[in-house]
């Protein structure tokens, strides 16, 4: 039970039950149901007993009589495991982490226990261009600290990874320094029929009517935002895109934001905050399944039918899993364009697409393929520069041609697979973009190497904003998230 929601909910607010109606068939209320006070009529009002029960629960919580665990199944408040007492930090001597080719990079390594340097710490370190370490050594830090130097003669990222061995356990820390990053060039080659392939894919997808459906979610709606679970057809009959739609309750024409997901299988909640800023928000899933089920439902799929879906169909551009994912993103914009619900519709000119990791790639692809997109945000974009590893340069997730165990390119890559993946390389989409974009990523990212993220930024067309956060790995800081959203809002509100 969401007690915060109970606190914020007006006691006299009418709550609505779910009711499914096709998009475009909106009525005077968000559900399309008939006004009334019985549940069967579509509405009910909390009775006196319910109100008293909520009030009692709040009082009991304040008094500490009721409590809920932070983790586990037992009662009471429990402490949680957060971090480790042993830490390994690696810090460059340039505050911006940026160096020129051939310049000496000086790293300071500290191993600490309870915040103080740990004398006699045994470490193993490796360093070199990211994904391709050239030096591996063991040493003892008599006073818990040391300085290690290196250099790189070509543009890229130079990484020092340190593993401390303490009491039979290993603790890691690393740092990737940027070396003339503005000169990084991706290796991705582009098929001659790239544009024709995608134009045909989108055209064929649109042979299938959208047939959208919308389901009002009263428990996720507020006085300012109506929230819906929606779906619409993708590239063939029966294959639907499911999403969470947030729209302002006030009728009018609004800019729109399409949120595209990172890798995985999960439910979605939408973006109430962004919607409250005066925007339509559509957050889509990519697997053709509803996005409001319990997490266990998605975990089962992720470990079975959808396990490693990013490897499905690599041998054939028409069988590649991401083909219907990308057409689904285009159909999502088709849905936004035709949206009319309770007097709310898209303004027809301001539309952003954004996401991180896999979602960063999908942002690049959608923007490149759909001229209705007016701006985009790509944060640590994955699936960029697949074949870079074949030239011993860091490649993007999911590292199709890189042997992570051996830290080298895979043996005997299939030339056909190399060719087919070029149709799904974020670099080839970025080169075709002409509208403003926001890029952000971390230099310490082990999933999406910054070499690929920076190289993709370097070749992207249009006006672009770069905001790296060097210390981040495959995550973002609150300040980074706030900046990202502020940039999107500024772009969407430029042309009211």
Predicted regions and their residues:
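C-terminal catalytic histidine-bearing segment of alpha/beta-hydrolase fold enzymes
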Residues: 447-450, 454-496
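Glycine-biased, low-complexity coil/linker segments
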Residues: 71-72
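Short beta-strand/loop motif that positions the catalytic acidic residue
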Residues: 433, 439-441
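Cap/lid segment of the alpha/beta-hydrolase catalytic domain
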Residues: 266-327, 339, 388-391, 395
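N-terminal cap/lid segment of alpha/beta-hydrolase-fold proteins
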Residues: 93-97, 206-251
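Hydrolase active-site cap/lid region
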Residues: 360-412, 468, 476-479
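Alpha/beta-hydrolase fold nucleophile elbow
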Residues: 343-356
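Short beta-strand element of the alpha/beta-hydrolase
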Residues: 243-245, 253-263
């Amino acid at each position: 039970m969401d007690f915060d929601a109970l606190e914020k909910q007006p006691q006299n607010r009418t709550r609505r039950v779910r009711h499914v109606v096709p998009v475009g068939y909106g009525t005077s209320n968000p559900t399309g149901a008939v006004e009334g006070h019985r549940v069967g009529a579509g509405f009910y009002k909390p009775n006196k007993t319910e109100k008293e029960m909520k009030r009692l629960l709040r009082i009991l919580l304040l008094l500490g009589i009721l409590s809920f665990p932070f983790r586990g199944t037992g009662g009471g408040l429990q402490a949680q495991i957060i971090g480790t007492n042993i830490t390994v930090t690696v810090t460059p001597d340039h505050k911006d982490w940026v160096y020129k080719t051939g310049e000496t990079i000086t790293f300071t390594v500290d191993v600490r226990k309870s915040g103080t340097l740990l004398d006699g710490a045994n470490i193993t370190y490796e360093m070199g261009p990211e994904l391709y370490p050239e030096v591996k050594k063991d040493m003892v830090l008599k006073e818990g600290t040391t300085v290690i130097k290196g250099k790189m003669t070509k543009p890229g990222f130079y990484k020092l990874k340190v593993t401390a061995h303490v009491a039979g356990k290993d603790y890691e820390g690393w740092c990737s320094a940027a070396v003339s990053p503005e000169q990084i060039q991706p290796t991705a080659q582009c098929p001659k029929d790239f544009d024709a392939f995608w134009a045909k894919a989108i055209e064929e997808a649109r042979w299938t009517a959208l047939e959208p459906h919308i389901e009002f979610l009263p428990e996720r709606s507020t006085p300012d935002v109506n929230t819906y679970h929606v779906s619409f057809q993708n590239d063939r009959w029966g294959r639907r895109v499911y999403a969470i739609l947030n729209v302002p309750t006030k009728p009018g024409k609004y800019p729109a934001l399409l949120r595209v997901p990172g890798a995985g299988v999960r439910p979605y909640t939408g973006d109430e905050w962004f919607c409250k800023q005066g925007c339509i928000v559509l957050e889509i899933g990519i697997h053709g399944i509803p996005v409001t089920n319990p997490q266990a439902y998605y975990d089962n799929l992720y470990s079975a039918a959808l396990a490693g879906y990013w490897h499905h169909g690599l041998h054939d551009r028409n069988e590649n899993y991401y083909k219907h994912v990308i057409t689904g993103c285009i159909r999502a914009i088709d849905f936004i364009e035709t949206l009319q619900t309770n007097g709310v519709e898209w303004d027809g000119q301001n539309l952003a697409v954004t996401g991180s990791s896999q979602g960063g790639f999908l942002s690049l692809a959608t923007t490149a393929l759909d001229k209705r997109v007016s701006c985009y945000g790509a944060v640590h974009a994955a699936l960029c520069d697949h074949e870079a590893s074949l030239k011993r340069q860091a490649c993007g997730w999911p590292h199709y041609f890189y042997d992570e165990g051996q830290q080298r390119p895979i043996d005997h890559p299939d030339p056909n697979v190399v060719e087919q993946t070029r149709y799904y390389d974020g670099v080839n989409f970025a080169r075709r973009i002409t509208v403003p974009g926001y890029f952000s990523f971390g230099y310490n990212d082990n999933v999406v190497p910054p070499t690929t993220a920076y190289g993709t930024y370097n070749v992207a067309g249009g006006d672009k904003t770069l905001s790296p956060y060097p210390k981040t790995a495959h995550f973002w800081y609150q300040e980074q998230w706030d900046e990202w959203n502020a940039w999107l809002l500024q772009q969407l509100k430029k042309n009211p």
